[in-house]
Amino acid sequence: MEFWHDTARSRRWLGRLILFMVLLLLPAAVVGLFARPMADDFGYSAATHAVAVQYGFDLPRLLAAAWDTTVHYFNNWQGLYVSGFVLALQPGLFGNRWYGLTFFWVVVPLFACLWGCARLVVRRLDPKVRLLAPALAMLFLFAFVQGMPNPAEGLYWINGAVNYQLYFA
């Protein structure tokens, strides 16, 4: 742990680690840009997509349509709570090319969660060490993304990602 107390040296290594991890995650992000909606994506976002086509980015109408979708699926299907609302606001509302943002929509909250968890553990062990938490979070994120059994459903398909990954975060 002495290494992490030397702030200048640990900042340099943290910068290198972040750059290395970003380079390792870059192929997964590039693949994510080619993701397209499928299956349940169309049903959950039908009402909000209709609003987006008719009115553009009209936030009050989009939120109202997302709320109506949530109420509909809650009453008629499986009792979705928050995920029905989030699924109705998926990135592909304004066109399929925006659906590729799903990867980032999942990975950013996941990284924030892992950073928070690592920060709690590191501060409990040694409150003076501040730069170890982001390093651990990057390592855990890399392991999480690379070790996922089915990345197509967990990172690139909004329905699978929101219902399972986002709540982990």
Which role does the model predict for each range below?
Residues 1-27:
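Start-transfer (signal-anchor) and selected internal transmembrane alpha helices
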Residues 105-128:
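Transmembrane-helix motifs of polytopic, lipid-linked glycan transferases
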Residues 101-113, 161-169:
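Membrane-embedded alpha-helical segments of multi-pass membrane proteins
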Residues 69-104:
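Short hydrophobic/aromatic helix or loop-helix immediately within or flanking a transmembrane segment
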Residues 13-17, 74, 127-138:
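Membrane-interfacial loop-to-transmembrane alpha-helix junctions, especially the N-terminal start
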Residues 21-29, 111, 115, 136-146:
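Hydrophobic core of alpha-helical transmembrane segments in multi-pass integral membrane proteins
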